[in-house]
Amino acid sequence: MGHGLSCSRDTDEYDLFRAAQLGDIHALSALLAADPALARRATVYDRFTALHIAAANGRLQVLSMLLDRDGDVDVLSRKKQTPLMVAAMRGNTECVVRLLRGGANVLTFDSPRARTCLHHAAYYGHAECLQAILGAAAQAQGPVAASWGFARFVNVRDERGATPLHLAARHARASCVRLLLDKGAIVSAPTAVYGFPGSTALHLAARAGSMECIRELLAWGADRLQRDSAGRIAYAVAMRRGHRACAALLNPAAAEPIVWPSPLKFIGELEADAKALLEAALMEANREREKRILHGSDINIKGGDEEEESEDEEEACNICFEQACSMEVKECGHQMCAACTLAICCHSKPNPKTLLLHPPACPFCRTTISRLVVATTNSNKTNSRRRSRSRSSSFKGGLSSAMGSFSRIGRGSGRLVVDGSSVGELADKPDHDFSSVAAAAAICDT
């Protein structure tokens, strides 16, 4: 008789887990109505509950029903993994959001490597899940703010000293790298033993051969000269792995990339549309640098006469006279293109010890820039445009000399020894890019 009851219970458990896997809400409801205790049963080996199984398979209705029945949102499997971790691994964003809304703890660590749900989302490259978790962690009244603080959570380490940024870079998850950097991940933090002791995200991206991750990391100020515990820079790692294109970008002899000016307070306060314009200008400038490094020649990208004429109908930038004005200094109302605005913001480098950066000044009126917005278009600005051009004509001599001085940055040649052998073919320094708009920054020093 006892054997019969045991078989019946095992069958009910199997049916429950099967219904959770397939999303059969009606079968699940019937089973739980007959025996509510089934909701707490777990599989024999992995100790997955129906909640884990629903989260892993993206069964949102089943998940919601189980949570509404007072299911334990942070129930642990054999490896101490929560349903939130499982959903983040599988990229089931809707389930992640529902679990977070149900009070799932983002600070739970699993047992294999002491990783959080943030680690798992970054490792598997699920940027939407990552965004949802970071959004929940950023809540002012949430448990992260009360105990850890958001900045510490973004840079949380596993037992091998790897942060979510390290995992994303090692597995070439460029969208996750971008998101984590934007949320405050420390770009040059070293690992303890993960990958190779002392590796930064740049070392790990070089090991993976991910050009996209390397672009993102360099644009956020990753140090090409930082060494791991064996004394290797990221360039040496890329060369050893045979990723020659990555090595060309990482070569310390090559021109430095333009770095996102995150230390500036008003950069952190940019509205989404203004931030998107500046980010696009940054990536375009660094892609031009990349082309020069990889192809060894200047690439002149200009539109035809028709395109130039259509741009001229808009308010042209009075610094480069090439692009339409897209950014406006809020205090004084002067306008520039996104590329020139970025050149001004990136001209001065922050103090590496304090990361302090003095705010730049408007190149036209010398007002300290404290806020940037997207420029408002107005077709009837002929008079103001003429006045602005006449005002900027006094800068033309300085612009020419500044362009020359900026273009010489990074010029020359050099050789770097990697593992005892010199690599000369990749060590020639190309001209510094961004010279067409770098003159804008020189105005700030006059």
Swiss-Prot record:
Key word Cytoplasm present: no
Catalyzed reactions: S-ubiquitinyl-[E2 ubiquitin-conjugating enzyme]-L-cysteine + [acceptor protein]-L-lysine = [E2 ubiquitin-conjugating enzyme]-L-cysteine + N(6)-ubiquitinyl-[acceptor protein]-L-lysine
Signal peptide bounds: none
InterPro entries named in the record: Ankyrin_rpt (IPR002110), Ankyrin_rpt-contain_sf (IPR036770), RING_XB3-like (IPR056760), Znf_RING (IPR001841), Znf_RING/FYVE/PHD (IPR013083)
Documented EC number(s): 2.3.2.27
Keywords assigned: ANK repeat, Metal-binding, Repeat, Transferase, Ubl conjugation pathway, Zinc, Zinc-finger
Pathway(s) served: Protein modification; protein ubiquitination
Keyword Metal-binding (UniProt): yes
Segments passing through the bilayer: none
Sequence segments annotated as region (Disordered): 376-401
UniProt-recorded name of the protein: Probable E3 ubiquitin-protein ligase XBOS31
Species of origin: Oryza sativa subsp. japonica (Rice)
